[in-house]
Amino acid sequence: MAINDNRFINMNNKKQDNMISSEIRYKKTEKGMMITEYYGNDSYVVLPDEIEGEPVTILGDYAFSRNLSVEEIWMPLELKEVGRYAFYRCRNLRKLVLGNRLLDMGGGALTGCHLEEVEIYLQDGKKSCLKSIVEEMRYQMRIYLHAPEGGQEAKLLFPEHYEEAVENTPARILETHHHGAGGYYRQCFYDRELDYRKYDEMFYHTVAEDTEETAVELALNRLRFPAELSDKNRQGYEEYLKKHMTAVAKWTVKQEEVEGIRFLQRRKIWTEQSLQAGMDFAAEGSKTEILSIFMDIRKDQFPKKKKTFEL
């Protein structure tokens, strides 16, 4: 899917019309303007791209530390450095939006956070700070990579992973048990770039170690936004979905994923049985719009045969 420059225009528009946060402290450095502190209590924070005509390139140490109000932060597009413990114990921070001139996060920047979403606008090549973000977060994360005109956007899922210390009494040792496939996905980077081929090759770990819902979401994301997706891996994702269409129906209803439902319609992947399952899930959840869509697809793809009578 080609992405035009409107995405960057839209990002900048969000930083206009009095949406830019003014409750900041800053100072001028040799590397550009540094935001040293955000002292507001808004849940949605948009940081300025420029201060006094100079680009904001640094977010200082502890800039958002212990802020329990902030839930979403739009970072300066020219940002190149994030200091140590910048978001320390921002327990309610769920989403970051940033450009890719930032290649690393300072030590402990996300300690005590529970990030769920990250959007990165790829302005210069494919390198970004994504690796340092997902390595610091053990929770499941949804990632959106927006490319400039002519590129492909990606919508990715990084599953959860965690370690558990289990006592081996006979051997008198503690063994480390790993849970979830997320650890494998967090190793799919080379020189700060995501290796899509390696990412796709980890899918069997998701199938074996994570929930069916997680595997469905990951596979559908890769099919809908196929950045650097090989034919072999495309086929693998599609075959998985075809074998788990009831779970697909349940997930699309739960997420109200209309575009995902339509995508599977265009690919002729829905079966009559899975459409009926989707209708049942939608009816149970009182999601009338989704129910109507499933009914229309079934009517279109599996029309009832008219009965004929012979005299």
Regions found by a protein language model. Give the residues of each.
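Ankyrin repeat A-helix N-terminal signature
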Residues: 251-257, 281-287
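Residue-level signature of the C-terminal ends
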Residues: 222-226, 267-268, 285, 297, ...
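Repeat-mediated protein-protein interaction surfaces in helical alpha-solenoids
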Residues: 219-237, 259-264
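Extended, charge-rich intrinsically disordered regulatory tails
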Residues: 272, 308-311
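Ankyrin repeat structural motif
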Residues: 257-265, 287-296
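Extended amphipathic alpha-helical coiled-coil/heptad-repeat regions
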Residues: 282, 294-309
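Structural signature of tandem-repeat unit edges
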Residues: 2-9, 19-33, 39-57, 68-81, ...
